Amino acid sequence: MPNAQLIHTPNTRDLVVISDGTGITAEKFAHSLLTQFDIRTKTHRLPFIDTVDKAHEAVQRINDLASRAEQQPLIFTTLVNQELGEIVKKRARGFHIDLFNTFIEPL
């Protein structure tokens, strides 16, 4: 049986979902948005990122993905702790969408 891993094609992007909870809702939201575009994604959900050390580990994983991919990863975050969000925003190599600051904060 062939390897079930997704093979990257020019239209495949790494999608990284980072949350201080399970990340399930953020992942569903990200997939809903991305259905508007003709791209395939390989999803990497990083749940329970609730400490500075875990945020740095997440950044390292994202940057490892970015170094191997043709296109920058898409990063969707739902981190309540602003310090953790800033670590990801400033250090991760990818296109970052902070779902809390984009949608929740204006409410």
Task: Tell me what each language-model feature is.
Residues T43-L46, G94-D98:
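Conserved beta-strand scaffold positions in the cores of enzyme catalytic domains, especially
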Residues M1-L33:
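N-terminal accessory targeting/assembly segments
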Residues V16, F76, F95-I97:
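Hydrophobic/aromatic beta-strand patches that form the interior of the parallel beta-sheet core
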Residues F95-L107:
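Long, charge-dense
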Residues I24, R45-L65, P73-L79, E83-L84:
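Metallocofactor- and cofactor-centric catalytic cores in central/energy metabolism, strongly enriched
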Residues T12, E70-Q72:
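A general structural motif
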Residues Q82, E86-K89, F95:
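Polybasic/polar functional segments that serve as interface/processing modules
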Residues S32-T41:
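Short helix-loop-beta junction
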